[in-house]
Each structure stands twice: as structure tokens, then as C-alpha cells.
Design a protein with these regions (language model features):
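Hydrophobic transmembrane alpha-helices and their immediate loop junctions
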Residues: 1-172
Length: 172
């Protein structure tokens, strides 16, 4: 439910900017919306669309937590936590997560797309290495969380691919 509402946040922002939606693709890391005119959005508007999913999760998480507190709905805290965790995870600057795209857009708006690509790719590698280190530490300490190691490795591979593409673009 949290992932579906996250994508609804992106969808609502795209609709607000009158961008037609072509489709929705499910992947191992969640869902990806395909929109026809998103390339024509300004950096600022694309940043709004990128952060709208996390914004939706944050609003839903806070509202669910408030509702759970005031109406003694203990299970609601699980839903609130899922929204907040999904929001925080998606804000990590690791491709293909929203945080990486947001960082790329912000830096690109200031310094151009080549610098934006390079900064986002480097941040992605560094953050995914930190995530992998934390996952390995967790596994060594608790003998649990092996799936987190695999997820961190997948994110590291994605970040390394982006770094390779950014380096190639700078050389051209």
C-alpha cells in the first residue's frame, strides 16, 4: 500500500503539470511510471515530480501515526512506519531511487547535466558502499539481514553503472 501511494504521489504531480502517463512498470525496486512529456519539464518541475512520491509517503505516515495515537490503533503504527521507511529509503542518493534523481536534478540546474550526472553517480557509489558496510555489520552482529546485503549489492551495481556512464559522458 505504501509503495502504491508513493507512485500515486508521482502520478498526481505529473497530472498537475499536464504530463500524459503512458504506463506503469513493476520492477524489483518498486514501480516506474512512464510519462511522455517528462523530458520537457524544467529542472524545478521535474524535481517536484521526483519528490512527490516521498512527500506522499511522509504525509501518509504522519497522518497514520496521528490517527493511531488519537484512536488507539496500534496496527496503524506499522503502516505509518512503512510509509516513513519507504520515504527515507527512497531519498537515499543511490540510483534508481528518487534521492539520486533529485540530487542529479538539483546539481544539473546549478552546474549543468554533466556535473549533475557525475555528482549523483559518485554520491550513489559512496552511499551504496556505506549501506553495504552497514548491512554486512548487521549480519555479522545478528546473523540476520542477509537479504539487505543482496539489496545493497544490487544498489551498488546500479550506482557503479551510473558512475561508468557519467565518466564516459565527461570524456566525450
Amino acid at each position: 500500500l505504501a509503495a502504491a501511494l508513493h507512485e500515486c504521489g508521482h502520478l498526481l504531480a505529473l497530472r498537475a503539470f499536464h504530463v500524459p502517463i503512458e504506463g506503469l512498470r513493476l520492477s524489483a525496486f518498486g514501480a516506474v511510471l512512464h510519462a511522455r512529456g517528462v523530458q520537457r519539464l524544467s529542472y524545478g518541475r521535474e524535481l517536484v515530480v521526483t519528490l512527490a512520491g516521498c512527500g506522499m509517503n511522509l504525509v501518509c505516515g504522519v497522518l497514520t501515526a496521528w490517527f493511531s495515537l488519537h484512536y488507539v490503533w496500534v496496527e496503524g503504527f506499522v503502516f505509518a512506519g512503512a510509509h516513513i521507511l519507504l520515504c527515507a529509503f527512497n531519498l537515499l542518493p543511490i540510483p534508481p531511487l528518487d534521492g539520486s534523481h533529485a540530487l542529479n536534478l538539483a546539481v544539473s540546474a546549478l552546474f549543468g547535466p554533466l556535473v549533475g550526472d557525475a555528482v549523483a553517480a559518485l554520491a550513489g557509489v559512496l552511499c551504496s558502499l556505506a549501506l553495504l558496510g552497514g548491512a554486512v555489520y548487521l549480519y555479522v552482529q545478528t546473523r540476520g539481514g542477509a537479504l539487505v546485503i543482496f539489496a545493497a549489492l544490487a544498489l551498488l551495481l546500479s550506482a557503479l553503472k551510473e558512475l561508468r556512464l557519467a565518466r564516459r559522458a565527461i570524456k566525450v
